[in-house]
């Protein structure tokens, strides 16, 4: 974007702010999902759309554009950093939850990895009561939004294989592989090692069956060598539309129509401008909250939508009694190990290995399935108690049973192992579990401070989650100690084989994981798309229960964790949600 367009962006934002205009649709948050919704709704020239975004337009920021310096923006001004204290399961450590503060949201600061997950996980959404939400339906929207750039022959030789039938070729979102993936030695040795461990190469991660080993695509433009975030993909082609405006500001709460009907009716949002002024913007039709899995529940609570017990403590009158708001927060549990290489590896290592429960637990799988099933009720009771009964034990147990079925009967992938070369002769091996039974929560910390949420991480709060992460860690260690991959490894520099030997006991693993496990920043579920009686916040039309015209579209509505990176599902969900909103026009 040139200087003129930058000034134009600021001018439009200023004018919209100064007038406190009214639009057909107003979207809180110009992030990954919000800009998808804005683009699709504004395709009709007679529909006016406004996006309120607190962050800047960073499309020309070299740090954002770069595909070589991943996570360089983690401590920058374009990154929200929300603190959280863990429980004794993780040694009461401080954790930081991060989200993008920019046009494009977290898609402007993340690792760009594009993995959708398993078919059965999406089909479970429909089993949970979300009519029409299943693998086939969401899959069609994945293809609608994607412009997949096929890899070169050189890239294919080092593992960048693909199945053209599972990708789109004319959507707005570029998806492909970096120009230089890795030299051949790493791919050949890693492929052979994983194949010897029963996890051989697959053609494509994104066809709904990701079990195995393969290079992972990323949301980037391989021809230009730049990141493809939602601002580039969805806002750039739409920014010249006169019916689409971006307003600089921070949404605080929904404004409501007077009256006490059965359904609450939103009239717009109240937001804070960069100057600190409190301004109201009107919505003729609907408001859409796309403020992230951290902030979307906060906006609802600040507006009187949530658990009356929590709202009362905050001094907020209850507008809609909806106890599920802010609950069911789920994240992946991630751990990293570092290896020194015997020779340097050039290029990007971007390979994912995704195992099932059988791959991870082996002969213990059946007995573990049985013992775990017996614990679901007690886990559900304990989790319900931590939220003072916000979601009933029976509702949680029903959701747990479906998750248990996915893990042990549907044979979904339950973990991911992802190596990255550090550029200084080292290799960072990250591994995480994808389907934890540990849930946390996110709520307002005070009535008027939406900037500092109260986050309860609650990671590794069930013994199964610890057992699962331990088993995945052992699988990771085994791979790097198995030929021919071990030929590339000089030693394990962190934690080191002295602290965590290859034959480490369960107790040694527990000590290591409790001191080192982190949140993977793949948060979903805090405004879950579920029936209200199951702890849901939005229905299958992404409309907030008890409201006539309030919708939520972002990672917060994904009802259960997926074996993928959250960004890809958010794009698919947002595309489908946009059509659900459009359907209400008829």
Question: What do these predicted regions represent?
Answer:
Residues 157, 486-498:
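Short, glycine/acidic-rich hinge or "gate" loops at secondary-structure transitions
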Residues 1-20, 288:
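Fungal secretory targeting signals
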Residues 19-53, 101-102, 106-107, 243-252, ...:
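C-terminal structured subdomain/cap of oxidoreductase catalytic cores
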Residues 126-257, 266:
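Conserved redox-cofactor binding core of oxidoreductases
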Residues 16-145, 149-152, 321-322, 332, ...:
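N-terminal glycine-rich phosphate/pyrophosphate-binding loop and immediately adjacent elements
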Residues 84-91, 270-277, 355-357, 421, ...:
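Short acidic, glycine-rich loop/turn motifs
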Residues 96-104, 116-121, 164-174, 210-216, ...:
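Surface-exposed beta-strand-to-loop junctions
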Residues 155, 168, 297, 307-423, ...:
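Mid-to-C-terminal "cap/lid" subdomains and adjacent gly/pro-rich loops that border
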């Amino acid at each position: 974007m040139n200087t003129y367009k930058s000034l134009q962006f600021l001018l439009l934002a200023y004018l919209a702010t100064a007038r406190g205009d009214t639009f057909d649709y107003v979207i809180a948050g110009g992030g990954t999902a919000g800009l998808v919704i804005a683009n699709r709704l504004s395709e009709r020239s007679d529909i006016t759309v406004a996006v309120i975004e607190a962050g800047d337009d960073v499309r020309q920021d070299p740090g954002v554009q770069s595909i070589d310096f991943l996570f360089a923006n983690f401590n920058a001004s374009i990154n929200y950093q929300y603190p959280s204290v863990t429980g004794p399961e993780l040694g009461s450590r401080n954790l930081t939850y991060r989200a993008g503060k920019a046009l494009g949201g977290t898609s402007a600061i993340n690792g760009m990895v594009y993995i959708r997950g398993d078919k059965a996980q999406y089909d479970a959404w429909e089993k949970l009561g979300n009519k029409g939400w299943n693998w086939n339906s969401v899959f069609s929207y994945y293809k609608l939004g994607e412009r997949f750039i096929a890899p070169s022959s050189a890239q294919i030789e080092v593992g960048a294989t693909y199945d053209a039938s599972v990708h789109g070729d004319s959507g707005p979102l570029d998806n492909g592989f970096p120009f230089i993936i890795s030299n051949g030695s790493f791919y050949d040795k890693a492929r052979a090692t994983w194949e010897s461990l029963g996890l051989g190469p697959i053609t494509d991660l994104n066809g709904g069956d990701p079990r195995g080993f393969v290079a992972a695509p990323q949301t980037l433009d391989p021809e230009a060598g730049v990141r493809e975030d939602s601002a580039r993909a969805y806002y750039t082609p739409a920014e010249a539309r006169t019916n689409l405006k971006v307003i600089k500001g921070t949404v605080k709460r929904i404004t409501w129509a007077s009256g006490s009907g059965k359904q609450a009716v939103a009239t717009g949002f109240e937001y804070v401008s960069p100057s600190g002024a409190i301004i109201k913007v009107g919505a003729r039709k609907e408001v859409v909250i796309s403020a992230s899995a951290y902030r979307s529940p906060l906006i609802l609570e600040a507006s009187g939508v949530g658990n009356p017990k929590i709202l009362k403590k905050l001094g907020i009158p209850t507008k809609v009694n909806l106890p599920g708001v802010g609950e069911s927060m789920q994240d992946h549990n991630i751990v990293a190990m570092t290896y020194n290489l015997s020779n340097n590896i050039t290029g990007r290592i971007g390979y994912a290995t995704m195992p099932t429960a059988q791959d991870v637990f082996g002969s213990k799988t059946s007995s573990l399935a049985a013992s775990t099933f017996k614990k679901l009720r007690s886990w559900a009771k304990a989790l319900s108690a931590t939220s003072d009964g916000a979601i009933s034990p029976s509702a949680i147990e029903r959701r747990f049973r479906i998750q248990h079925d996915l893990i042990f009967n549907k044979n979904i992938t339950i973990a991911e192992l992802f190596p990255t070369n550090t550029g200084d002769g080292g290799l960072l091996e990250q591994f995480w579990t994808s389907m934890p039974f540990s849930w946390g929560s996110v709520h307002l910390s005070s009535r008027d401070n939406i900037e500092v949420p109260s986050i309860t991480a609650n990671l590794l709060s069930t013994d199964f989650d610890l057992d699962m992460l331990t088993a995945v860690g052992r699988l990771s260690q085994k791979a790097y100690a198995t030929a021919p991959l071990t030929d590339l490894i000089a030693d394990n520099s962190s934690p080191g084989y002295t602290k965590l030997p290859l034959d480490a006991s369960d107790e040694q693993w527990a000590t290591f994981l409790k001191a080192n496990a982190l949140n993977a920043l793949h948060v979903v579920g805090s405004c879950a798309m579920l029936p209200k009686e199951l702890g849901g916040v939005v229905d299958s039309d992404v409309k907030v229960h008890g409201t006539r015209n309030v919708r939520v579209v972002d990672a917060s509505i994904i009802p259960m964790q997926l074996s993928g990176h959250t960004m890809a599902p958010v794009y698919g969900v947002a595309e489908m949600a946009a059509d659900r909103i459009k359907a209400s026009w008829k």
